[in-house]
Each structure stands twice: as structure tokens, then as C-alpha cells.
Amino acid sequence: MSDSDASRPSAIASDGPDAAGKHASGAPWRNFYGRFKGKTLKPNQVRDLDEMLPELSPGAVGWDENPEREPLDLEAQFQGRDVWLEVGFGGGEHLVHQAESNPDVGIIGAEPYVNGVAMLLGKLRKSSAENVRVHAGDARDLMDVLPAQSLSRAFLLYPDPWPKARHHRRRFVTQEHLEPLARVLKPGAIFRVATDIPDYVRQTLEEVPKAGFKWLAEGPEDWRKPWGDWISTRYEQKALREGRTPHYLTFQRQD
């Protein structure tokens, strides 16, 4: 993967903040480094976005509909079940696999790239899973309104590597993202990270523990072998074809 990988979000230009550093809606200004849309959507994908996405909403996430940032009612959404979060679900293979394998768990996926959202919806249309909610936007906005200590597990799988050194601050594994994630995870919750980029591994191992996580590894096999419930994604297959080695990192949220 690279900055020019068309299958991942790429840099875009956007309007700047006002003098107070906020949008007109009151939302804090957050740089988004990526595309929201790629190839032209097929008619069935447009239909899925129009028909399915509103039904799968986790609730009022956007600043325009929830300016007071009231917490989402996950109890109403998932009837008391454990809730998991996948940050940047790509084409949705892993999310659908987990939803089908764990019907007693609620899963929220956050993905700003509309083509990826459309791919997930297409898979869900063919799936029996009824335990999924989808936020088609920035995970930071979602984490704003998730209740504290409400999630039992989180996944970050083959995120955009931003390989250039000057772009490393754009990676998810910075405190800007990790501290909000730690806030919404329960003590003891699991955070899984998969990546094929050695420097991303390095930054992950440096930054994630600073946010209150413990790396659960006793030996090399703990990060060389995939998790027992793993399904290989298209991004992983691309990495393997190009000769890169996947790493599977497991962290636990501390008290």
C-alpha cells in the first residue's frame, strides 16, 4: 500500500476553519486526509446507500444533528449485548465475518470512504447478520458520542500506512485517536491491530501503550500468527502478493 494506492483514501483539499478553529456547526476542525469517494458507484450501490444506510445508523453522530454531543443509546441499539467497533472497515469482509460469527455481539463499523461503505452494504444485503450499525464518516466523530467504557473490543485492520515520515502524524496510532478510543473501551477490552508495514508496527508499539493499553505478547508467534477467528481481507492478500509480512498485534485496555 502507498499514498497512491487507489483502494485507500488519499489526500484531499478542504476549506479551512473559522477564526475560532471550528466549523459553522460548532464542530472542532479536524483535518481529514483522504478521499471520500473513488470510482463511480453502480446503481445497486447507490440504492443500498439510499435504502440501507439510514436503517443501519448507530444514531445521531454528526454535529449538525447532535450539536450537544449527547451519547448514543447503545442499549436501545443492541439490547444489552457487548458492542465492538471496527475503525476503517475497507470492503467489509472482516466486519461481516465477525457479525455472522458473533450474532450475540453488536458491531459498529466506521468508514468515511463511500465506496467501501457501499461494498459493505452489498455484503450485508446478502448476509443474515442483523447486529451491524454503520457510521459512514470519521471515526473521531463517532467516538465523540460513544458512551465512556461502552465497547468490549476494537479493530484497526490494515489502516492507511502514510509511509512518508512527514505524514506519520496522520496515522490512526497517534494520541489524537488513541485517547478517545481508550475512553470508550471498557477496562479489559481488546484492541486488535493488523498491518504489513514495519514502521507502522513500530509506531503502534510505541504509541498504543501510552494511551493505557498493554501489549499481549509473550513470544514471536503471538504477532506472527493471525487470530483464531481471523478472515484474510483483500488488503492482506495484496500485501502477501507484494511480499510484505502481516503483523497481528493484540492490546488490552488497562484500568
UniProtKB/Swiss-Prot annotation:
Pathway: tRNA modification; N(7)-methylguanine-tRNA biosynthesis. S-adenosyl-L-methionine binds at E86, E111, D138, D160. GO terms for molecular function: tRNA (guanine(46)-N7)-methyltransferase activity. It is an enzyme of class 2 (transferase). GO terms for cellular component: tRNA methyltransferase complex. The active site is at D160. It catalyses: guanosine(46) in tRNA + S-adenosyl-L-methionine = N(7)-methylguanosine(46) in tRNA + S-adenosyl-L-homocysteine. InterPro entries: SAM-dependent_MTases_sf, tRNA_(Gua-N-7)_MeTrfase_Trmb, tRNA_methyltr_TrmB_bact. PROSITE patterns: SAM_MT_TRMB. SUPFAM superfamilies: S-adenosyl-L-methionine-dependent methyltransferases (SSF53335). Substrate binds at K164, D196, T233, R234, Y235, E236. Keywords: Methyltransferase, S-adenosyl-L-methionine, Transferase, tRNA processing. Residues 1-29 are annotated as: Disordered. Disulfide bonds: none annotated. Its EC number is 2.1.1.33. HAMAP family: tRNA_methyltr_TrmB. PANTHER family: 3-DEOXY-D-MANNO-OCTULOSONIC-ACID TRANSFERASE/TRNA GUANINE-N 7 - -METHYLTRANSFERASE, PENTACOTRIPEPTIDE-REPEAT REGION OF PRORP DOMAIN-CONTAINING PROTEIN. Catalyzes the formation of N(7)-methylguanine at position 46 (m7G46) in tRNA. Belongs to the class I-like SAM-binding methyltransferase superfamily. TrmB family. This is tRNA (guanine-N(7)-)-methyltransferase. It comes from Ruegeria sp. (strain TM1040) (Silicibacter sp.).
